[in-house]
């Protein structure tokens, strides 16, 4: 289930608000400039190639490309037995920005995006079918969990713009 928990810094042990209704979550995020959509997700076979997954969602990807000017897409897949899962998680957990929008569509599995907005931190747990667009230059971090198990499509304007610029600020998960 897609959920949004809102924390107030520095008291991050207990959320001050939790939402589970998708439309309420999308509306609140939109007020902060963050886009959340739900696409129909059909889990691909476990060993599906990136090409197979991109073909499966071609029409939706092309619609976004035309609407927003994105030019390319790829697939990221992390599993509990991925050789670099610990290092990747540590990297994702560092607050960073990108010089372009961060667009992710969860094909399978889930993960949590954290976006600090003023004195609050939004924790959005995305699941299969969720498309998230975090605007360019917005600080955020991502927790895929100790044993990540997700497949997501990443959509870019320029793959070089996806490179993270780390802020060095403290995060939590």
UniProtKB/Swiss-Prot annotation:
Keywords assigned by UniProt?
A: Amino-acid biosynthesis, Dioxygenase, Iron, Metal-binding, Methionine biosynthesis, Nickel, Oxidoreductase
Q: Which reaction does it catalyse?
A: 1,2-dihydroxy-5-(methylsulfanyl)pent-1-en-3-one + O2 = 3-(methylsulfanyl)propanoate + CO + formate + 2 H(+); 1,2-dihydroxy-5-(methylsulfanyl)pent-1-en-3-one + O2 = 4-methylsulfanyl-2-oxobutanoate + formate + 2 H(+)
The membrane spanning regions, by residue number, are none
InterPro entries linked to this entry? ARD, ARD_bac, RmlC-like_jellyroll, RmlC_Cupin_sf
Coiled-coil residue spans: none
Q: Which residues bind Fe(2+)?
A: 96, 98, 102, 140
What enzyme category does the UniProt record give? oxidoreductase
Site description Important to generate the dianion, residues in chain: 104
What is the required cofactor set for this protein?
Fe(2+); Ni(2+)
- List the Gene3D superfamilies hit by this protein, alphabetically: Jelly Rolls
> Where is the site labelled May play a role in transmitting local conformational changes?
101
Could you give the subunit structure recorded for this chain?
Answer: Monomer.
Q: What does this protein do?
A: Catalyzes 2 different reactions between oxygen and the acireductone 1,2-dihydroxy-3-keto-5-methylthiopentene (DHK-MTPene) depending upon the metal bound in the active site. Fe-containing acireductone dioxygenase (Fe-ARD) produces formate and 2-keto-4-methylthiobutyrate (KMTB), the alpha-ketoacid precursor of methionine in the methionine recycle pathway. Ni-containing acireductone dioxygenase (Ni-ARD) produces methylthiopropionate, carbon monoxide and formate, and does not lie on the methionine recycle pathway.
The name of this protein is Acireductone dioxygenase 1
What organism is this sequence from? Answer: Pectobacterium atrosepticum (strain SCRI 1043 / ATCC BAA-672) (Erwinia carotovora subsp. atroseptica)
């Amino acid at each position: 289930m897609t959920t949004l928990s809102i924390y107030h810094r520095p008291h991050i042990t207990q959320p001050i608000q939790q939402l589970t209704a998708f439309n309420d979550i999308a509306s609140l995020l939109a007020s902060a400039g963050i886009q959340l959509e739900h696409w129909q997700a059909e889990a691909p076979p476990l060993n599906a190639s990136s090409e197979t997954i991109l073909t499966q969602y071609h029409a939706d990807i092309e619609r976004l490309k035309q609407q927003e000017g994105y030019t390319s897409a790829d697939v990221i897949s992390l599993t509990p037995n991925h050789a670099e899962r610990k290092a990747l998680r540590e990297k994702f957990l560092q607050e960073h920005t990108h010089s372009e929008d961060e667009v992710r569509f969860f094909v399978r599995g889930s993960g949590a995006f954290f976006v600090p907005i003023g004195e609050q931190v939004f924790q959005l747990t995305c699941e299969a079918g969720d498309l998230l667009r975090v605007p360019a230059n917005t600080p955020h971090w991502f927790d895929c969990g100790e044993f990540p198990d997700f497949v997501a499509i990443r959509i870019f304007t320029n793959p070089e713009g996806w490179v993270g610029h780390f802020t060095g600020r403290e995060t939590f998960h």
